[in-house]
Amino acid sequence: MPKEVITQRSVDYNQWYLDIVREADLAEVAEVVRGCIVVKAHGWAIWELMQRALDDRIKATGHANVQFPLLIPKSFIMKEAEHVEGFAPEVAEVTRAGGEELAEPYVIRPTSETIIGYFYSKWIRSYRDLPLLYNQWANVMRWEMRTRPFLRTAEFWWQEGHTAHATEAEAEEETLRILHEVYADFVEKEMAVPVIRGLKTEKEKFPGALRSYCIEAMMQDGRALQAGTSHNLGQNFARAFDITFTDQHNTIQYAWTTSWGVSTRLIGALIMTHSDDEGLVLPPRLAPIQVVVVPIYKNDEERSAVMEAVNRMTAAWKGRLRFKVDDRDTYSPGYKFNEWELKGVPVRIEIGPKDVAKETVALARRDMPGKAGKSFVPQAGLTERIEALLAEMQTGLFQRALAFREARTADVTTYDELKEQIERGFARAYWAGSTADEKRIQEETRATIRCIPLEQPGTVGRCVYTGRETDRQVIFARAY
């Protein structure tokens, strides 16, 4: 498995990303189905760990999992005007079934606000039925024109939460709770990816939403990636689907609803935040295999002694570490080292006859490729040493990504400075422009306002585009 399979980031960043997806065995383009991918075992194992950590957080905030139909009557999509306009180009329709034309076409789920809204209108009658807090894990389809594995595909996998509340304040509280306690917490603690928490502009918000909040991350090419969104839908979908309830005063009111989701594009964020020119780098908490052991021997006698030591060593790891012993005799140790490095396994343990005699092992850490990350350590206390090292690596990856983002983020005061800064990263600027101004900037620079950060400086400055005074800052960047 030669190193040349990975294009260097400095040569072609896009090809580097595609090479890692392929060589780390994460996914394969499904060329027989336009815009779709096959998520392979290693990629799906990462997604399963993400699901588990997210699901725990979602349930801890009082939500239950449900499952709604994949097919949605087209008339449902047409009920909410902004929603229709936002999703019309991406919708895939089913018009025939059982050899006949359907009386009404179905839309393959692009998102589920409409069909869930229909059922909520049946289930909610009284204020006693609120809040209704549901989440579903599902696949969705959006007919994307330009696709890239994990980052943008026609079919992808996600969770989508949908809740209904008695008041706007409760819906807003829910929207922000998900943003902070579920999404930002997960992405920073599990993925080791620092995020900016913010509000979307009117131009960038979810179609049909009252307000959209997001978390934005910086990739190694300086571009932004939207890692999660949480929407306060106001009463727009409640009015479209007649989601009403009788309040404590026996008055009929429309419910206030929210929706929020993250998807398999987080795997793309993971790749582009931490990986290097040697291959995939995974934060230990999301590594399907945290430790790989490569036994080294030349004959049956050596094999017996080495494997006895390996079995004794790994017995203490069960239930504490996710590990694999790579004792395949059909591949050389060098091949195995390269393979597991490509796949991003955080820690590699090498053990041969000399190590058995000395009661030591060679330990290589993935976040420090080459000699810098390799050391010889005693077998005694190895379990605790590895656990401490994994925790150190998790923190180190986050701090490294945070330092990178800070180094690539700059305050700009003029439009020329903005255009220069977005070539290398995030531009932070005061903003008092209109949606039309936003569109012009995007047309001229291909950059968008990623968010209005929730943390504001509390000072006044002049808008980078209009020159008007404002106390609001925004983040401009090119994005995936």
Swiss-Prot record:
Superkingdom to which the source organism belongs: Bacteria
Free-text domain note: Consists of three domains: the N-terminal catalytic domain, the anticodon-binding domain and the C-terminal extension.
Keyword ATP-binding: yes
Family classification: Belongs to the class-II aminoacyl-tRNA synthetase family. ProS type 3 subfamily.
Enzyme class: ligase
PROSITE patterns for the chain: AA_TRNA_LIGASE_II
SMART domains: ProRS-C_1
Name of the protein in question: Proline--tRNA ligase
Quaternary assembly: Homodimer.
Main location: cytoplasm
Single GO cellular component term: cytoplasm
EC number: 6.1.1.15
GO biological process entries: prolyl-tRNA aminoacylation
Record keyword Zinc-finger present: no
GO molecular function, one term: proline-tRNA ligase activity
UniProt keywords, alphabetically: Aminoacyl-tRNA synthetase, ATP-binding, Cytoplasm, Ligase, Nucleotide-binding, Protein biosynthesis
Organism annotation: Chloroflexus aggregans (strain MD-66 / DSM 9485)
Cross-referenced HAMAP family: Pro_tRNA_synth_type3
Function description: Catalyzes the attachment of proline to tRNA(Pro) in a two-step reaction: proline is first activated by ATP to form Pro-AMP and then transferred to the acceptor end of tRNA(Pro).
InterPro entries reported for this sequence: aa-tRNA-synt_IIb, aa-tRNA-synth_II, aa-tRNA-synth_II/BPL/LPL, Anticodon-bd, Anticodon-bd_dom_sf, Pro-tRNA-ligase_IIa, Pro-tRNA-ligase_IIa_arc-type, Pro-tRNA_ligase_II_C
Catalysis performed (reactions): tRNA(Pro) + L-proline + ATP = L-prolyl-tRNA(Pro) + AMP + diphosphate
Intracellular or extracellular location(s): Cytoplasm
